[in-house]
Regions:
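Conserved SAM-binding loop
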Residues: 4-5
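Conserved SAM-binding strand-loop segment of SAM-dependent methyltransferases
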Residues: 10-17
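Redox-cofactor binding/interface segments in oxidoreductases and associated redox assembly factors
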Residues: 17, 33-34, 76, 291
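Class I S-adenosyl-L-methionine
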Residues: 22-29, 39-276
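Short connector loops/turns at beta-strand edges and beta->alpha or beta->beta junctions
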Residues: 37-41, 71, 294-295, 327-328
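C-terminal target-recognition/interaction regions appended to catalytic cores
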Residues: 200-368
Length: 368
């Protein structure tokens, strides 16, 4: 929060409080933007419980704000597994979210976007949801197209006339798709839906008037930025470099494993995982950064320093660059938190493009 205020200043409306108690103080607004915690949907966490998890339930606080204020537009973000959660009833959680939007009077378009596909230096896949109220011009256009053209109209929206296509163009679609209804004629209420609904959602999709259509999309790929494009070239502190004594441990962390391990209660289990590149290839975009970046862990990037060729971890500045932030955006906080912050962050150019798109929609709305 201090980092935010350092860049944007202090204002009375900047409230860093528990959303459960602070939501009553939220003023009227036209755009609701948020990202509810991802741990209960993430593949990085074992036993993730989805919308029922301790953090996944924060969706219901967003839903309460949605119903209380009825903003014209809503932009939300989460991990790519959101559309598949939970593992034992795939698509249930996302169906619940879509049904909530339907009941509140919104249509929704979603897209799973890999930042590297659109010219960024990180292979960071995230699910973005854009919801628009049923009295907006975009809603009327979507409803008319789907009513008249059916699935052909849905294709047109996803490929050309919807929210995401103008800023993140698609090459086309694969043959994988799903469609169905989430309205009260199919499921009496959320309890009924939660008990019975299971669906395979894909990377692109729409929900209008309770009907959803989802298809596996093929992005129109832009030239990507390789990891080497963000690496610092100035001499770096020794703490970033791997010592000779640590190399074997890093090789073990990154290597393939098939071994017997012991639980805390003394029982054993067989553990298996594949190998990772060591060091990371600098001619490709970086892997997805996690909040543990910079620590001694399997997921931490290790690169050959461009000046010395010695193996090292990424610096906080390099992590900022991977997300499109200016250098030293997080300066002033402990280094551990700088890595943690970037592991939680979005890729800025993607969000900036969405912001401009929303602004254009709002201007069109005023003219219509």
């Amino acid at each position: 929060f201090e980092c935010y205020e350092r860049h944007f200043g202090h204002r009375p409306e900047h409230v860093c409080q528990n959303i459960v108690t602070a939501k009553e103080n939220i003023p009227p607004h036209d755009l609701l933007v948020g990202g509810f915690p991802c741990q209960d949907y993430s593949i990085a966490k074992k036993g993730a419980r989805g919308i029922e998890g301790k953090k996944g339930v924060l969706w219901w606080e967003i839903n309460a704000i949605l119903r209380a204020h009825k903003p014209r537009y809503v932009l939300l973000e989460n991990v790519d597994r959101l559309i598949k959660s939970p593992a034992w009833q795939k698509g249930r959680d996302f169906s619940i979210i879509l049904r909530c939007f339907y009941e509140a009077g919104y249509a929704v378009e979603w897209r799973v976007i890999n930042a590297a596909d659109y010219g960024e230096a990180q292979r960071r896949r995230r699910t973005f949801l854009f919801a628009f109220r049923n009295d907006t011009a975009l809603f009327r256009k979507a409803a008319e197209l789907i009513c008249v053209e059916g699935l052909k109209g849905a294709h047109q929206l996803l490929l050309q006339d919807g929210f995401f296509a103008p800023i993140f163009p698609l090459y086309g679609f694969e043959r994988k798709y799903s469609e169905g209804w989430l309205d009260e004629f199919r499921y009496l209420d959320l309890k009924d839906l939660s008990a019975a609904q299971s669906c395979h959602f894909y990377a692109s999709g729409l929900m209008v008037n309770g009907r959803f259509y989802s298809v596996e999309s093929i992005p129109l790929q832009f030239p990507y930025k390789p990891l080497c494009s963000v690496l610092e070239t100035a001499p770096l502190a020794e703490r970033y470099f791997l010592s000779a004594a640590d190399i074997d441990h890093w090789r073990y962390l990154k290597g393939a494993k098939q071994e017997t391990r012991h639980r805390r209660n003394g029982s054993t289990y067989f553990f298996s995982e594949g190998s990772m590149a060591f060091p990371d290839r600098s001619d490709l975009p970086a892997r997805t950064m996690l909040t543990s970046e910079g620590s001694v862990s399997r997921s931490t990037h290790v690169v050959a320093d461009p000046q010395t060729q010695r193996l090292r971890t990424l610096t906080p500045i390099e992590c900022e660059r991977l997300n499109g932030f200016p250098d030293d955006w997080t300066a002033g906080m402990p280094e551990r938190l700088r890595y943690f912050t970037m592991g939680n962050a979005l890729v800025v150019p993607l969000v900036k493009a969405m912001g401009k798109r929303i602004s254009a929609l709002a201007e069109d709305e005023q003219r219509s």
